[in-house]
């Protein structure tokens, strides 16, 4: 499913359910006389009332995290400036949060903004992330907003065939541009990782090659770590 289509699907899911509750289209009875008013059925009225209050749950709960560059220093441990921002579990709560936070193009230089499955911290040391790795895409400065949104929609909408492998994603704002990284659990599972990388490129219509780096390699070799997989 294309990213734009996922966005429309999540936005109009409630409308489709309402249509189904109304018998699939709400056609006018052929025997009604001209000018006669069709009364709303009790079932439809009841469903409409529920749709106003009932939210649409996601497969998993997710948490936004912000790493504030103004509190970072070389003397503090990595991740000490991470702050839990908001946890959401429904489509409506996601949009409520997303529409009220800064998008990557508006974040300050050096900022990292994360979205991870609830109770997974965006750290290499987290038990769920420890044996994983990351796919990474690069963007020109101020050009990652749409790709960040579509990455979020693909994750929380459970669009990946190996969605259980995904821990979360982070967008990083730097002087030379922006990067989006997709974190996964089991780096050694090549089949799952390659599938995720290919689908991610497809969802974002991203044409450049992307590489996958093991967390273990990144910890040992830092910027000298090499891609283990490329798609």
Curated annotation (Swiss-Prot):
GO molecular function ontology, one term from the record: RNA 7-methylguanosine cap binding
GO cellular component: cytoplasm; eukaryotic translation initiation factor 4F complex; nucleus
Chain positions recorded as mRNA binding sites: 74-79, 106, 124-125, 174-179, 219-223
Disulfide cross-links: 129-167
Impact noted for substituting residue 58 to V: In haplotype 2
Membrane-spanning segments: none
Reported effect, residue 48 to F: In allele pot-1
Effect annotated for changing residue 85 to L: In allele pot-1
Residues covered by region (EIF4G-binding): 56-59, 66-102, 150-159
GO biological process: defense response to virus; regulation of translation; translational initiation
Compartment(s) where it occurs, according to its Swiss-Prot or TrEMBL record: Nucleus; Cytoplasm
Disruption phenotype: Impaired mRNA capping activity. Slightly impaired growth and fertility. Increased resistance to pepper mottle virus (PepMoV) and potato virus Y (PVY) strain LYE90 but not to PVY strains N605, LYE72, SON41 and LYE84 and to tobacco etch virus (TEV) strains HAT, CAA10 and S103.
Modifications the protein undergoes after translation, according to the UniProt entry: According to the redox status, the Cys-129-Cys-167 disulfide bridge may have a role in regulating protein function by affecting its ability to bind capped mRNA.
Function: Component of the protein complex eIF4F, which is involved in the recognition of the mRNA cap, ATP-dependent unwinding of 5'-terminal secondary structure and recruitment of mRNA to the ribosome. Recognizes and binds the 7-methylguanosine-containing mRNA cap during an early step in the initiation of protein synthesis and facilitates ribosome binding by inducing the unwinding of the mRNAs secondary structures. Key component of recessive resistance to potyviruses. (Microbial infection) Susceptibility host factor required for viral infection (e.g. potato virus Y (PVY), pepper mottle virus (PepMoV) and tobacco etch virus (TEV)) by recruiting viral RNAs to the host ribosomal complex via an interaction with viral genome-linked protein (VPg).
Note: Displayed sequence is cv. Mospomorist and cv. M82, and confers susceptibility to potyviruses (e.g. potato virus Y (PVY) and tobacco etch virus (TEV)).
Subunit structure as annotated in this protein's UniProt entry: EIF4F is a multi-subunit complex, the composition of which varies with external and internal environmental conditions. It is composed of at least EIF4A, EIF4E and EIF4G. EIF4E is also known to interact with other partners. In higher plants two isoforms of EIF4F have been identified, named isoform EIF4F and isoform EIF(iso)4F. Isoform EIF4F has subunits p220 and p26, whereas isoform EIF(iso)4F has subunits p82 and p28.
Family classification: Belongs to the eukaryotic initiation factor 4E family.
Protein name as catalogued: Eukaryotic translation initiation factor 4E-1
């Amino acid at each position: 499913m294309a990213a734009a289509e996922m966005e429309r699907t999540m936005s109009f899911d409630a409308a489709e359910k309402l249509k189904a509750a109304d018998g699939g289209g709400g056609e006018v009875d052929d025997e009604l006389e001209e000018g006669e008013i069709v009364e709303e059925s009790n079932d439809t009225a009841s469903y409409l009332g529920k749709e106003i209050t009932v939210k649409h749950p996601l497969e998993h709960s997710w948490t936004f995290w912000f790493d504030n560059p103004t509190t970072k220093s070389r003397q503090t441990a990595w991740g000490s400036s991470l702050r839990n921002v908001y946890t959401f579990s429904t489509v409506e709560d996601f949009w409520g949060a997303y529409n009220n936070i800064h998008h990557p193009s508006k974040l300050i230089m050096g900022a990292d903004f994360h979205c991870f499955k609830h109770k997974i911290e965006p750290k290499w040391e987290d038990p769920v992330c420890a044996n994983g790795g990351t796919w990474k895409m690069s963007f020109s400065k101020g050009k990652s907003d749409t790709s960040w949104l579509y990455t979020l929609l693909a994750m929380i909408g459970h669009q990946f065939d190996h969605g259980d492998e995904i821990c979360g994603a982070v967008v990083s704002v730097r002087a030379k541009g922006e990067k989006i990284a997709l974190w996964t659990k089991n780096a050694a599972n090549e089949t799952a990782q390659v599938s995720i990388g290919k689908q991610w490129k497809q969802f974002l219509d991203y044409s450049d090659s992307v590489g996958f780096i093991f967390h273990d390699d990144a910890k040992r070799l830092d910027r000298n770590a090499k891609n283990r997989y490329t798609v």
